[in-house]
């Protein structure tokens, strides 16, 4: 892709998300979503091949459907309230439709089917944008209208997302699909706490973005897309491969790594609100995620694939530069659990 075109598209993507973040008018919010969607489709098709075209088409159809439902909900809300203000949500039908539209954009269950397919069909860099930056706008809108949301609907979608995010990743060997199912599960955790403590959802989002960005940068450094190619990177960069495995365990929520912090705090907050059964089920379902991360770590770190090449230098891999931000990102996404008591200063 031409660098100038990529800069223009990136600026449009950021502008669309920024409009959603700062807008208090429903039409401007919808316009920001459309700007963002139309600009990211060429980015998804950056590697011009049938797979990326199919992924971009699936993404477009899903997002266009969600935008249509969102506009319908906005019109219904306008008919009942007579206002375009985001915080003025008086109609339960409009609130439910907006929730469905935004969860479809996020890729929560039962609207999750597009996430693994689209992520697998695009490049690692496009997948990083898809699973991090593209979550900001819908979640910011949910954050603004959390008082009007249907708690029971969100809880049902949250449990489904955590369950499908765990089950879906069990038989996967493609790392991009594993990251996609991980994203579905993490979104489920964020939505579960949205109506109780939206600030905790924001903290969960920040930690999720840090961990996912670290993981994708490490995979980009090694040009790794499958478990087989991951196991073959020991010859090239054993330290980086170790960091990949630690980051995977952090994504799974294994203590004492950073990924355990949001799960711990969400379970604590739900318990404070006299909800015992829900966090219990969520904790059990989270073990599915942790299981396939542990299995991936075991198969990569503790077993050796048969090879006919005794050469220790992996000459077939491209050499890539270590990004300056990689080290602090990895440290933040794995080692910040001891700093958790400092979060009490924010409350």
UniProtKB/Swiss-Prot annotation:
Function description: Core subunit of the mitochondrial membrane respiratory chain NADH dehydrogenase (Complex I) which catalyzes electron transfer from NADH through the respiratory chain, using ubiquinone as an electron acceptor. Essential for the catalytic activity and assembly of complex I.
TM regions (residue ranges): 3-23, 25-45, 59-79, 96-116, 127-147, 149-169, 178-198, 201-221, 239-259, 274-294, 322-342
Record keyword Transmembrane helix present: yes
Protein name: NADH-ubiquinone oxidoreductase chain 2
Major enzyme class: translocase
InterPro entries according to UniProt: Complex_I_Subunit_2 (IPR050175), NADH_DH_su2_C (IPR010933), NADH_UbQ_OxRdtase_chain2 (IPR003917), ND/Mrp_TM (IPR001750)
UniProt subunit comment: Core subunit of respiratory chain NADH dehydrogenase (Complex I) which is composed of 45 different subunits. Interacts with TMEM242.
GO annotation, cellular component aspect: mitochondrial inner membrane
GO BP: any one term: mitochondrial respiratory chain complex I assembly
GO MF: NADH dehydrogenase (ubiquinone) activity
Enzyme Commission number, as recorded: 7.1.1.2
S-S bonds: none
UniProt main location, coarse: mitochondrion
Membrane topology qualifier: Multi-pass membrane protein
Alphabetical UniProt keywords: Electron transport, Membrane, Mitochondrion, Mitochondrion inner membrane, NAD, Respiratory chain, Translocase, Transmembrane, Transmembrane helix, Transport, Ubiquinone
Compartment list: Mitochondrion inner membrane
Protein family: Belongs to the complex I subunit 2 family.
PANTHER family for this protein: NADH-UBIQUINONE OXIDOREDUCTASE CHAIN 2
Substrates-to-products reaction catalysed: a ubiquinone + NADH + 5 H(+)(in) = a ubiquinol + NAD(+) + 4 H(+)(out)
